[in-house]
């Protein structure tokens, strides 16, 4: 059928888009706008998955103005359809097809049945189960949180859930090293992407961390980011195309943007929804002279709605630098540094009062006064009395209630999340081993002896350069046949994956992984507990990054750190400074870089020449460093904000969230569904044992391509712990693209839309006709409203007997399905032709019955949306009265969303999605 502008067409692959209208044509493509979803698609004419929508005389037509009428006649003029329709005022009016409502109900299932496109009964069962799972996953509070390839760490899940559910979140993630800020940012981002709150994301990082972020986003979150640099952008200059509009997920370096201001203009015009900046503490700011980098990020933060800044802890930053980060997030709230300082000073006594509450101490009169001043609108006297009572349960309840009220009013608690190792359980100890050698060249011999002595252990060795790692591998292989994997920045991501997998293999893998310091960025090896620093990192931050490859949450054993170096060499003195001055081998040292800068001149002498400082001078340096460290440590401890830590940690709620995901991990429901899905689609499965399988495409699949399935096959696991140890395996969860897109493949395609089966039942007359009808209630609305959380596509099952009675509640789906047998294709086609009249009558009966079942679902969705959105609006309005960090714009957006959501839910409709005709026989 020829295309014409103004014609109405339906997408066969994306039914939820509603009825589209052709807006543009050229020789090869057709452009269709879908008003209901506010989406545009461009299709190749030759293979467009589109169906022309033509209504017939006697059918009901829905006008975009909201009324319906019976079609009296249809005329075709130059490819466009004109309908003569009886409107509600009983007038005959002409309706052009462009005026038809974009929200359309259709029943392709019936068309497929009567055109002999009939599937097996097992395909129908897969479709129904898929629809049920789709509904459950849209409603799940775990959606967007459970699919990360990471251990279930409560504080990370709490931050991801808290921030991810917000509208346009703007927050500072300031956890201590090793607590997973990158994972938190990725989980927040994934949550927002799943909810379709954001679609275009820009991540700005230091140049050395670009690949780390690329790897983390891909391996942990299945997010495919593109790295942008000058070379990539140059490719688009001749075409006058803004390169930043060619990808939705982009990573680039801060230094590159600083040195190429013309690219910054392109970024500003690319309409990103979300900005993530790592190492944000390096953005230098003062009231009189902010740095170029700071001003650059400030420009972006002004126009990009969602902003996540990953930074050092506020104590490390200093108050002025901390204010500068907050100013990027909310310049209206944090407009003046001196005002901010006064607010912080005023708040410190409240923090002290919280320390008393947490320590179960009696509150002093001064502490009570400070709490009362902050909670003016709340009568706190009864809580004070309860705390002073002898009833332990009442005491604890009152203390928790006071703490929660103070958290809600925390000066920056809604914008700032900061966890410390002291506040988070699960860290092992670090044990330092100084290995003193006679000569520098003895290091290789020592390493060989060490590996032979620890043959049953996994050893992680970090060298300064890739060349050293490569040479060591050759020496170990040739001299002692020691199995070693190499890991460095010159390898591709796939090559690094293979090396990591070889090292992770407990049975036949490498004993040792030889890595350059840059090459290991973004990779963690908690299954190993022995670290050899073949070359010492050049500064404390790099040292912490190296140790942090093993010393992370999830490490089950104490981490052994070995540093081999020649006696009295520059390396040995640097090791002593790290150990005796900073204690950086056995503990994290937040003040390490500050002390490194303070003693930079002396350390330069140490590193360049072991005799540049006498032993007395060097001992003096160690004492000075230790004294300065202890002084800084006391200051940092004084500045700890326990209230902020409580808010960041999430407490019992965070643990409950982790437990919920763990329970789902252990449920067989996903495994059963996925294996059945692969089986019916025609994907080959090979069981490898140890909770993993290889899935491969075949030439007999029901679809030409299965999402995420490579030609050479993919190894997958449903086991979180195995996925953490074996990065080359895909970790399948309900959130994995392969499962989500597999569900979409079935739900939006034709698999199982019409089926027929035989029921052997001696108690029913032979030839008795039953029909199973699956309707779907849905709202065709803009993605940003996230109406799927209130009204996901919801299946309604009817099972009609030959008299039109719904017996679905009496006969469960799985019970019935287990008793059905397949019918041959020829018999199926003959039976459908013979019973067509009865089938059509039963479908019409189903259309009548479903209304009374669908309307309460829509009403409940509206009620739920109203209650949930109103509750959040009321909560934020109440908090805004006592906490300036609640943005009015956030409340305004929520109010608009509530109005629009209720309006769109009022337009929700239902459609017949699939059907199964069942014929009985005695045998």
Swiss-Prot record:
It comes from the Bacteria. ATP binds at residues 175-182. Keywords: Activator, ATP-binding, DNA-binding, Helicase, Hydrolase, Nucleotide-binding, Transcription, Transcription regulation. Residues 443-597 form the Helicase C-terminal domain. The keyword DNA-binding applies. Its EC number is 3.6.4.-. GO terms for biological process: DNA repair; regulation of DNA-templated transcription. Residues 162-332 form the Helicase ATP-binding domain. SUPFAM superfamilies: P-loop containing nucleoside triphosphate hydrolases. The keyword ATP-binding applies. A motif (DEAH box) lies at residues 278-281. GO terms for molecular function: ATP binding; DNA binding; helicase activity; hydrolase activity, acting on acid anhydrides. CDD domains: DEXDc_RapA (cd18011), SF2_C_SNF (cd18793). Transcription regulator that activates transcription by stimulating RNA polymerase (RNAP) recycling in case of stress conditions such as supercoiled DNA or high salt concentrations. Probably acts by releasing the RNAP, when it is trapped or immobilized on tightly supercoiled DNA. Does not activate transcription on linear DNA. Probably not involved in DNA repair. Interacts with the RNAP. Has a higher affinity for the core RNAP than for the holoenzyme. Its ATPase activity is stimulated by binding to RNAP. Belongs to the SNF2/RAD54 helicase family. RapA subfamily. HAMAP family: Helicase_RapA. PANTHER family: DNA ANNEALING HELICASE AND ENDONUCLEASE ZRANB3 FAMILY MEMBER (PTHR45766), SWI_SNF-RELATED MATRIX-ASSOCIATED ACTIN-DEPENDENT REGULATOR OF CHROMATIN SUBFAMILY A-LIKE PROTEIN 1 (PTHR45766:SF6). This is RNA polymerase-associated protein RapA. The lineage of its organism: Bacteria, Pseudomonadati, Pseudomonadota, Gammaproteobacteria, Pasteurellales.
């Amino acid at each position: 059928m020829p295309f014409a502008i103004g014609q109405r067409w339906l997408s066969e692959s994306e039914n939820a888009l509603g009825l589209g209208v052709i807006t543009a044509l050229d020789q090869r493509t057709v452009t269709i706008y879908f008003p209901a979803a506010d989406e545009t698609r461009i299709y190749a004419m030759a293979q467009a998955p589109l169906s022309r929508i033509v209504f017939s005389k006697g059918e009901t037509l829905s006008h975009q103005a909201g009324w319906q009428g019976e079609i009296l006649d249809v005329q075709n003029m130059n490819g466009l359809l004109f309908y003569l329709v009886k409107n509600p005022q009983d007038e005959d009016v002409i309706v052009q097809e462009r005026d038809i409502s974009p929200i359309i109900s259709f029943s392709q299932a019936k068309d497929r049945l009567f055109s002999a496109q009939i599937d097996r009964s097992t395909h129908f069962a897969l479709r129904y189960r898929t629809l049920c799972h789709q509904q459950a996953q849209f409603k799940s509070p775990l959606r967007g949180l459970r699919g990360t390839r990471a251990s279930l760490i409560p504080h990370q899940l709490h931050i991801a859930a808290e921030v991810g559910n917000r509208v346009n979140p703007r927050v500072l993630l300031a956890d201590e090293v090793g607590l997973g800020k990158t994972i938190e940012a990725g989980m927040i981002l994934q949550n927002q992407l799943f909810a379709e709150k954001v679609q275009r994301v820009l991540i700005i990082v230091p140049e050395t961390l670009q690949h780390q972020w690329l790897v983390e986003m891909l391996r942990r979150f299945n997010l495919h980011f593109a790295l942008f640099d000058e070379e990539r952008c140059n490719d688009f200059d001749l075409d006058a195309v803004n390169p930043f509009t060619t990808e939705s997920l982009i990573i680039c370096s801060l230094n590159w943007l600083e040195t190429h201001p013309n690219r910054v203009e392109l970024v500003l015009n690319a309409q990103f929804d979300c900005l993530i900046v790592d190492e944000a503490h390096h953005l230098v700011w003062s009231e009189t002279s902010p740095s170029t980098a700071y001003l650059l990020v400030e420009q972006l933060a002004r126009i990009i709605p969602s902003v996540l800044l990953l930074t050092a802890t506020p104590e490390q930053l200093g108050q002025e630098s901390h204010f500068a980060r907050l100013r990027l997030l909310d310049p209206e709230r944090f407009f003046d540094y001196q005002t901010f300082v006064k607010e912080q000073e005023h708040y410190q006594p409240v923090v002290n009062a919280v320390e008393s509450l947490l320590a179960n101490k009696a509150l002093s009169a001064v502490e009570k006064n400070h709490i009362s001043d902050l909670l003016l609108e709340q009568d706190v006297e009864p809580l004070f009395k309860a705390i002073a009572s002898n009833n332990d349960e009442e005491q604890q309840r009152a203390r928790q209630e006071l703490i929660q009220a103070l958290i809600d009013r925390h000066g920056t608690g809604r914008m700032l999340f900061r966890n410390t190792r002291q506040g988070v359980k699960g860290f092992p100890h670090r044990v330092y081993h100084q290995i003193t050698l006679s000569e520098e060249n003895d290091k290789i011999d020592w390493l060989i002896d060490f590996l032979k002595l620890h043959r049953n252990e996994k050893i992680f060795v970090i060298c300064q350069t890739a060349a050293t790692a490569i040479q060591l591998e050759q020496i170990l292989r040739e001299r002692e046949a020691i199995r070693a994997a190499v890991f460095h920045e010159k390898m591709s991501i796939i090559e690094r994956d293979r090396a990591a997998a070889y090292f992770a293999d407990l049975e036949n893998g490498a004993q040792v992984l030889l890595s350059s310091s840059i090459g290991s960025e973004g990779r963690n090896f908690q299954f190993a507990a022995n670290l050899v620093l073949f070359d010492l990192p050049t500064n404390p931050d790099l040292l912490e990054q190296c140790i942090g490859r093993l010393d992370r949450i999830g490490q089950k054993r104490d981490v052994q750190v070995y540093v081999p170096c020649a006696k009295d060499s520059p390396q040995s003195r640097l090791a002593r400074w790290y150990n005796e001055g900073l204690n950086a081998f056995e503990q994290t040292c937040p003040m390490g870089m500050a002390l490194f800068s303070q003693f930079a001149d002396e350390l330069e002498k140490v590193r360049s020449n072991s005799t540049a400082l006498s032993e007395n001078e060097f001992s003096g340096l160690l004492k000075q460093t230790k004294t300065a460290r202890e002084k800084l440590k006391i200051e940092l401890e004084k500045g700890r904000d326990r209230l902020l830590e409580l808010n960041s940690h999430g407490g019992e709620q965070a643990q409950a969230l982790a437990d919920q995901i763990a329970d789902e991990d252990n449920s067989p429901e996903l495994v059963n569904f996925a294996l059945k899905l692969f089986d019916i689609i025609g994907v080959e499965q090979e069981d490898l044992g140890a909770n993993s399988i290889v899935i491969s495409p075949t030439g007999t699949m029901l679809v030409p391509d299965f999402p995420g399935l490579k030609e050479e096959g993919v190894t997958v696991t449903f086991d979180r712990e195995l996925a953490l140890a074996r990065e080359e395996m895909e970790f399948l969860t309900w959130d994995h693209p392969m499962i989500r897109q597999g569900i979409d493949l079935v739900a939006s395609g034709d698999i199982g839309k019409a089926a027929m089966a035989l029921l052997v039942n001696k108690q029913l007359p032979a030839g008795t006709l039953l029909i199973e009808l699956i309707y779907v209630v849905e709202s065709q609305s803009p993605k940003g409203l996230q109406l799927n959380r209130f009204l996901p596509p919801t299946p309604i099952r009817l099972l009609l007997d030959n008299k039109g009675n719904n017996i679905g509640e009496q006969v469960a789906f799985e019970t019935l399905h287990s008793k059905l047998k397949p019918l041959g294709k020829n018999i199926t086609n003959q039976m459908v032709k013979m019973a067509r009249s009865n089938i059509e009558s039963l479908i019409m009966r189903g259309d009548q019955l479903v209304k009374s079942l669908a309307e309460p679902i829509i009403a409940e969705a509206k009620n739920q949306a109203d209650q949930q959105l109103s509750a959040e609006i009321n909560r934020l309005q109440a908090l805004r009265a006592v906490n300036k960090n609640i943005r009015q714009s956030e409340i305004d957006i929520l109010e608009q969303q509530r109005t629009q959501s209720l309006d769109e839910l009022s337009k929700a409709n239902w459609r017949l999605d699939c059907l199964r005709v069942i014929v009985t026989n005695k045998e």
